[in-house]
Amino acid sequence: MVATVKRTIRIKTQQHILPEVPPVENFPVRQWSIEIVLLDDEGKEIPATIFDKVIYHLHPTFANPNRTFTDPPFRIEEQGWGGFPLDISVFLLEKAGERKIPHDLNFLQESYEVEHVIQIPLNKPLLTEELAKSGSTEETTANTGTIGKRRTTTNTTAEPKAKRAKTGSASTVKGSVDLEKLAFGLTKLNEDDLVGVVQMVTDNKTPEMNVTNNVEEGEFIIDLYSLPEGLLKSLWDYVKKNTE
């Protein structure tokens, strides 16, 4: 198994009203921006040079809704009258993988920050070199219930007998996602793609989510109905992409 380390990225959002622009449907038009930074081992912001590019998947009403940026801080600026949930795809250097992060663009505050912990492989020389700028590149010690025991297995940890994603959900729809179809799609993924599912769920785990990592049985059990709509949509997009 490939050794990994954890890093924390910070998504920074700012917005303000544009008083000179006429309102739309009685809502003021705002200028907003999002940028991404990395936190070092002291919690200080540094450029996120571990990423090759970042793609913001905006609301489809925007022209060219998938916006790509290749230079830190991967800042996007736009105007609009309403907030919306979006996905942000961050791509690690040397094609070491994509992480899709749900983000809520809202206008409750003029500025706010959200942090996400992601797992990063240590098998790419340039990526490891950039990782060293933010902290240790020693393999992360896994905690019970995290993806670490799947992706950072060492000689002191037994290899799981099999890697399976179990789903516990009724036949129902949440938001725009049919949970029954999602559950069926998960069963069609190969082992490598299932690792991506585990990564996405673990990176975005909250206390409200009912997720169990049964290491001894090699199972990662997900109650789909407990997942937020943004994450469910990301999982559905991932399943469709990897099963079509």
From Swiss-Prot:
Q: Where in the cell is it found?
A: Nucleus
Domain remarks = The YEATS domain specifically recognizes and binds acylated histones (acetylated and crotonylated). Binds crotonylated lysine through a non-canonical pi-pi-pi stacking mechanism.
Function summary? Functions as a component of the DNA-binding general transcription factor complex TFIID, the RNA polymerase II associated general transcription factor complex TFIIF, and the chromatin-remodeling complex SWI/SNF. Binding of TFIID to a promoter (with or without TATA element) is the initial step in preinitiation complex (PIC) formation.
Keyword Ion transport recorded: no
Q: Which GO terms describe its biological process?
A: chromatin remodeling; DNA repair; DNA-templated transcription; positive regulation of transcription by RNA polymerase II; regulation of DNA-templated transcription; regulation of transcription by RNA polymerase II; RNA polymerase II preinitiation complex assembly; transcription by RNA polymerase II
According to the UniProt record, where is the region Acylated histone binding? 59-61, 81-83
* Glycyl lysine isopeptide (Lys-Gly) (interchain with G-Cter in ubiquitin) cross-link, renumbered residues: K181
Description of how the protein assembles with itself and partners: The 1.2 MDa TFIID complex is composed of TATA binding protein (TBP) and the 14 TBP-associated factors. One copy of each TAF1, TAF2, TAF3, TAF7, TAF8, TAF11, TAF13, two copies of each TAF4, TAF5, TAF6, TAF9, TAF10, TAF12, and three copies of TAF14. TFIIF is composed of three different subunits: TFG1/RAP74, TFG2/RAP30 and TAF14. Component of the SWI/SNF global transcription activator complex.
Q: Where is this site: Acylated histone binding?
A: D104
Residues in YEATS domain copies: 1-134
Which family does the entry's similarity section mention? Belongs to the TAF14 family.
UniProt lists compositionally biased (Low complexity) regions at 143-157
- Any additional notes? TAF14 is the only non-essential TAF. Present with 3100 molecules/cell in log phase SD medium.
Q: What is this protein called?
A: Transcription initiation factor TFIID subunit 14
One example of the protein's molecular function in GO is: DNA binding
Principal subcellular localisation of the protein:
nucleus
Q: What is known to happen upon mutating V24A?
A: Does not affect binding to acylated histone H3
Q: Where is the signal peptide?
A: none
According to the record, the residues making up region (Disordered) are 133-169
Native organism is Saccharomyces cerevisiae (strain ATCC 204508 / S288c) (Baker's yeast)
* A Gene Ontology term for the protein's cellular component: chromatin
The alphabetical list of record keywords is: Isopeptide bond, Nucleus, Transcription, Transcription regulation, Ubl conjugation
* Outcome after substituting G80A: Abolished binding to acylated histone H3
Per the record's keyword annotation, is Plastid included, yes or no?
no
